[in-house]
Design a protein with these regions (language model features):
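Non-catalytic DNA-recognition/assembly elements of restriction-modification systems
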Residues: 78-153
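Polybasic, glycine- and aromatic-enriched phosphate-binding surface used to engage nucleic acids
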Residues: 1-91
Length: 153
């Protein structure tokens, strides 16, 4: 899977796809003993710092594309929620709610007919994206890390 950024999505329509070791797409199936929501996993996979890890290890291609092959994604440090810790459960649930809200906002944006209406939704989406980054940063202890301060090369 070649991309210029992370693009992990939740499939609401159970679309069937194929994929081998390097794409074109992957699917995640939640194991029975996994308590984390797939929306939570989606959020963490899309988190900018996790994507920097993928990019730092991946094969690079023309046009700033890089591989999201299984070998670069399978061992990512997905933060496991301690479901005995009420603070972590609260953050998990906020992340899930924020992802669901983002999905709704993006659908509403796509339904809009005028540029000003679309721009309004873009601003709302940006607010929710920032909130999501903050929540995930808190879990990883990275509240003081900023994307622009880290060298992506």
């Amino acid at each position: 899977v070649l991309a210029t950024q992370g693009n992990y999505v939740y499939d609401t329509k159970t679309i069937c796809f194929t994929g081998g070791g390097n794409g074109p797409f992957y699917g995640l199936e939640k194991k029975d003993d996994t308590k984390e929501s797939l929306f939570y996993i989606q959020a963490v996979l899309n988190y900018w710092m996790i994507e920097m890890i993928v990019k730092s290890k991946a094969s690079k291609f023309r046009g700033d594309y890089y591989s999201h092959g299984k070998q670069f994604v399978a061992q990512l440090p997905i933060y496991r929620i301690n479901f005995d810790d009420s603070n972590e459960v609260k953050i998990h649930d906020e992340i899930v709610d924020t992802v669901k809200n983002l999905m709704k906002l993006k659908n509403k944006r796509d339904e809009q007919q005028t540029k000003p209406q679309k721009e309004t939704y873009e601003r709302l989406i940006q607010i929710e994206d920032n909130k999501l980054d903050g929540l995930i940063s808190k879990l990883y202890g990275a509240e003081n890390c900023r994307r622009e301060d880290l060298d992506e090369e």
